[in-house]
């Protein structure tokens, strides 16, 4: 077996199961799970209908790694509309690659991007990432022979990795920089100046920027959608998106996490090599999935409604949780998480489950210990993915639990 498998840490939800083992919540209280970021809004009917229609004529042939040309075209035009790029700025034939959701793509991308042989030349490659982070950034880095390097995201730095705190020697060893905007779990959005700084560092030191933008369509202010890496690159004069790759998904945007559909877009030179890797990796997106994805990228009305529902939940839940935990909690710029402070994230999570049958996630499970500490310690992640009524009820139970004496 690959000895690097021993480097992988237990996944957050495995740790959560261990933490909650043996806890017996009140049987009279229905379980409200707010731990996993799995959208539970009803999927748009037109996506389901397109999927059913596609099944009638798509199961008799293998999908190709490149993806359907009409889907690549739809994605390219969506990127241009959404991020204010000129028409044909994104070439559908070599700048867009459909994938089976961002999780699969983030993993395989690192395998293609990391030059593990550089370790034999005396310099183990680095993959830099925010901390806390989506765990799929760390695992593939370890399996590719790279060393993960964690950049703490705290309230003091606006929950954005401090790029200027990284020394030149570290940047010279960096092969991939992961960004996540809006951030998971903080919801922080990277402004144009921040992305331009990342682009400057990438040009100087030669690393690839992998920007996870799967929450880009979940934002609070309809008048201010988050900027993306390709938009920042184009406006900075990098019109071919050199050393840039963005990852988008329908899971959050369209509430279809079970469809497993997304895309990678950016640097054509790199995507050509990445496509070669995927040809052998054997992970082409099924044709029926692609055909169901096509209308999803062409429609915005259902996404606007999605945002309305999340906005309503934030407005209703945030003040209740803030009052219960006796702290100021700002509604995040994007995403669907709250990231409040608690005295002990593990004890709070277990107690809340045992007494109120509500599941949240300890913040420490989403982060790693660094010289300056674990930025998830003393935080919990609350995923506002349930219905509005369930989120209201969960907030009420959190408030009741917070008022109860601890034993």
Task: Describe the function of each predicted region.
Residues 2-104, 108, 144, 296-297, ...:
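N-terminal small-domain helix-loop-helix segment of the aminotransferase-like
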Residues 16, 34, 51, 75, ...:
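Generic structural signal for small/hydrophobic residues in well-ordered secondary structure
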Residues 59-200, 217-218, 222-238:
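Conserved core of the PLP fold type I
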Residues 77-81, 85, 239-240, 354-359, ...:
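PLP-dependent enzyme catalytic core of the Aspartate aminotransferase-like
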Residues 78, 231-311, 318-320, 401-402:
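Conserved core segment of the aminotransferase class I/II
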Residues 125, 204-208, 241-242:
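A short helix->loop->beta-strand "cap" motif at the edges of active sites that frequently abuts
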Residues 144, 204-205, 356, 405:
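Helix C-cap/helix->beta junction micro-motif
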Residues 290, 294, 309-318, 328-342, ...:
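Conserved glycine-rich beta-strand-loop-beta hairpin in the small C-terminal domain of fold type I
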